[in-house]
Design a protein with these regions (language model features):
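Helix-start/capping segments and mature chain N-termini
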Residues: 1-76, 98-218
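Ordered, amphipathic secondary-structure segments that act as subunit-interaction surfaces
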Residues: 79-92, 99
Length: 218
């Protein structure tokens, strides 16, 4: 049996129900975060939550009611599902409004949805995995607030709607920005480089983790 969390309750996955009048469904009006769990431990939880808070503040979406107990809820969900390695998906939309209107009601109660799926870390298979990847390079024609981890990912979906490619690398004004589902690192003349943080890229948590690691190793 697999469990999710919706608003104030743990719910069996097959029983999760969200209104079609939710602004996340109608407008893609929401933000999300994905936190990996390795051997039962949350990876860089505080950093992920800080980015989630930034997304909420940038979009002026109200935080969920149980914000102070949020980590407790997440850890209980991890225990209930029992996978050693998991991917915790957190989505917060602006909430449900009966009248469809582009302009939001700032008193609307947000919808909180948390889901857990098993994360497969098959090291032996990865050692034998393909070493070459098919990548497409294209101009970034998505919106200009990629620093917000928004659920509106249609641009990314359209870019990746091709079974022949593994990833898309975006560029804007001649400069590489990010991948459709990744941050970019490159070794140039023996120096590791990555695009600087701006509104054109999402500040990856793992990206920053490796930057800090590289600086320590010098």
């Amino acid at each position: 049996m697999s469990w999710s969390y919706l608003n104030d309750s743990f719910v069996k996955k097959e029983d999760v129900k969200i209104s079609p009048f939710d602004r996340g469904f109608l407008f893609g009006d929401g933000v999300y975060e994905l936190i990996p769990v390795y051997r039962g431990k949350l990876f860089l939880y505080d950093e992920h939550i800080a980015r989630l808070v930034n997304s909420l503040e940038s979009t002026k979406i109200n935080p969920p009611k149980k914000w102070k107990e949020f980590r407790t809820v997440v850890e209980e969900l991890i225990q209930k599902n029992g996978y050693e390695n998991q991917a915790i998906y957190i989505q917060i939309t602006r909430g449900m409004e009966e009248v469809r209107n582009h302009a939001p009601n700032h008193q609307t109660v947000p919808t909180l949805f948390i889901n857990s799926t098993e994360l497969t870390l098959d090291i032996e298979n990865k050692k034998n995995a393909k070493q070459e990847f098919s990548v497409k390079v294209q101009e970034d024609m998505r919106w200009s607030r990629c620093d917000i981890k928004a659920i509106t990912l249609l641009g990314n979906v359209m870019s990746l709607n091709d079974t022949r490619i593994d990833e898309v690398i975006y560029h804007k004004e001649g400069l590489v920005t990010e991948g459709a589902k990744s941050n970019i690192f490159c070794v140039l003349d023996g120096i590791i480089t990555t695009p600087a943080i701006s509104n054109d890229i999402l500040g990856g948590i793992t990206r920053q983790y490796f930057i800090d690691l590289f600086l320590k190793l010098n």
